């Protein structure tokens, strides 16, 4: 089902002081030129998986003369985000017609064999990374103005003429990021797979750290509040770019809309502008983002500046309770995220997120000695916990249920555990019961798996959390991930919430958090 929001009578309330602070923190991006490494041949195998059948030094490609319908594939050796340049010339007689060719860029190998003409998803096909280019005069240096996120490139010659052929003399990419991989010291966790998971996590985060924390450099190329929360946590244990996190918080806080609500995401070009999308859980997470930042930096001035915005999101959410003192169920409308799970009911999970974020609000209020807010928040927290158990706990199932159909899902249980509705001992029993029962509505995104790992650790199941991390993110690596993906279902690698995996993001911010867990909770394993 398409998930988007259009808010009628949408009004943006800008705080120019906040936006000026954010602009002053805009990073100067780091540039590094990399060159194509190999020419490869790709095809589908018997299992219909894309495989490399041959690979040659890139000089092999540069020695070729290409004519109509010739297709070549290039491997840059690792994921890259940046601007591609092709150095072209010709062989044969004088160029008597434009050379016309097609380019496609892919974050994973499968994109090289995707038939883009067959795309039938509900997101814009404009997200597919392809170009049709005419070059009137050769030799030429063709610099693509659009930033691409990729490892692999296809070039197909649509036409030259009978008198000349196209020659490629060089392919390079001017990569960009706010941070440098070399600035983070590698850690040996005593397990090669964990070391690789940590590396790929950091690579994923680095590629998404641009002018802001982007959700994905291929798609959506903008800033989502739920992603920011996880990216910032990983950043504090790796690149430690505190200014970028501060910048992003001030952007969100400087672009409130109706009733003081925070937008779920912000567009960064041509100027900062909030999307007319409100997600209850994402807005509430601002309290978590703010406290995480304060604990990492001790920046009390920023906490004072942004405190009211964080607490207001809790006040707004409290107006969305029903007569039973739990969050009103808005059904299939795009009102709360939690996960992309098909059919996932979000009422109980949203209530749990509210309880969870009130705990962060209380901690913020205590730092600033806001006694009235502390009393109000503690009262509402107790009320919500009592209501959540009364409305959602099913004694017979031994799990929380959600919505009119009393649905039991992984997401609901995990968020109730993180909300600490029960004590730790009961939560530990619950998480093991969920693993044994394995509710039909499963987790499908690394975003939800992050919260699963978090819940395990909070239940003192650190070793189990480590094994689950290795199982999920490790399997992604075995499936070819250079950077971690937006969505990963080991049982259906082509699953997509958008109707086609062609527009899935294969370098996605919310999947970068294994490095956060490893470096925060497992550094004692360092050799």
What kind of region is each of these model predictions?
Residues 224-239, 243-527:
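Active-site core of glycosidic bond-cleaving carbohydrate-active enzymes
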Residues 1-215, 243, 248, 264-268, ...:
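Extracellular/oxidizing-compartment recognition motifs
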């Amino acid at each position: 089902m398409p998930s988007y929001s259009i808010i009628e009578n949408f009004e943006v309330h800008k705080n120019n002081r906040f936006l000026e602070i954010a602009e002053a923190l805009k990073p100067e991006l780091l540039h590094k030129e990399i060159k194509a490494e190999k020419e490869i041949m790709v095809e589908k195998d018997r299992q219909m998986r894309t495989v490399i059948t041959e690979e040659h030094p890139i000089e092999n490609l540069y020695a070729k003369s290409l004519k109509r319908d010739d297709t070549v594939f290039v491997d840059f050796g690792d994921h890259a985000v940046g601007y591609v340049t092709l150095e072209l010339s010709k062989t044969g007689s004088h160029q008597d017609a434009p050379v016309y060719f097609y380019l496609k860029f892919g974050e994973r190998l499968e994109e090289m064999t995707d038939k883009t003409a067959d795309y039938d998803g509900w997101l814009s096909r404009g997200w597919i990374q392809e170009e049709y280019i005419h070059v009137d005069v050769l030799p030429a240096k063709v610099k693509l103005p659009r930033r691409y996120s990729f490892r692999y490139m296809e070039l197909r010659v649509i036409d030259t003429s009978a008198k000349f052929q196209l020659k490629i003399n060089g392919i390079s990419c001017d990569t960009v990021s706010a941070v440098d991989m070399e600035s983070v010291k590698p850690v040996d966790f005593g397990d090669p797979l964990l070391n690789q998971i940590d590396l790929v996590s950091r690579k994923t985060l680095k590629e998404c750290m641009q002018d802001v924390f982007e959700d994905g450099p291929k798609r959506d190329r903008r800033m989502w509040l739920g992603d920011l929360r996880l990216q910032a946590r990983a950043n504090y244990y790796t690149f430690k770019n505190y200014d970028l996190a501060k910048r992003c918080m001030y952007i969100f806080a400087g672009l409130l809309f109706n009733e003081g609500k925070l937008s779920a995401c912000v567009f960064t070009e041509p100027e900062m502008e909030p999307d007319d999308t409100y997600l209850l859980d994402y807005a509430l997470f601002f309290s978590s983002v703010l406290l995480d930042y304060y604990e990492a930096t001790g920046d009390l001035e920023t906490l004072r500046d942004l405190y009211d915005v964080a607490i207001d999101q809790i006040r707004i959410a409290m107006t969305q309770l029903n007569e039973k003192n739990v969050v009103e169920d808005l059904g299939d409308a795009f009102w709360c995220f939690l996960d992309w799970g098909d059919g996932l009911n979000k009422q109980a999970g949203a209530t749990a997120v509210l309880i969870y974020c009130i705990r962060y609000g209380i901690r913020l209020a205590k730092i600033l000695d806001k006694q009235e807010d502390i009393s109000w928040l503690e009262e509402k927290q107790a009320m919500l916990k009592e209501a959540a158990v009364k409305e959602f706990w099913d004694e017979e199932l031994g799990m929380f249920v959600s919505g009119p159909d009393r649905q039991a899902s992984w997401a609901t249980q995990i968020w109730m555990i993180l909300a600490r509705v029960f004590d730790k001992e009961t939560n530990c029993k619950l998480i093991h019961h969920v693993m044994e029962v394995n509710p039909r509505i499963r987790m499908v995104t690394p975003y939800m798996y992050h919260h699963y790992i978090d819940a395990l650790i909070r239940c003192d199941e650190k070793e189990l959390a480590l094994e689950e991390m290795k199982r999920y993110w490790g399997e992604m690596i075995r499936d070819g991930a250079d950077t971690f993906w937006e969505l990963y279902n080991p049982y259906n690698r082509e699953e997509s919430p958008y109707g086609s995996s062609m527009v899935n993001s294969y370098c996605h911010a919310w999947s970068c958090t294994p490095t956060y867990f490893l470096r925060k909770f497992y550094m004692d394993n360092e050799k």
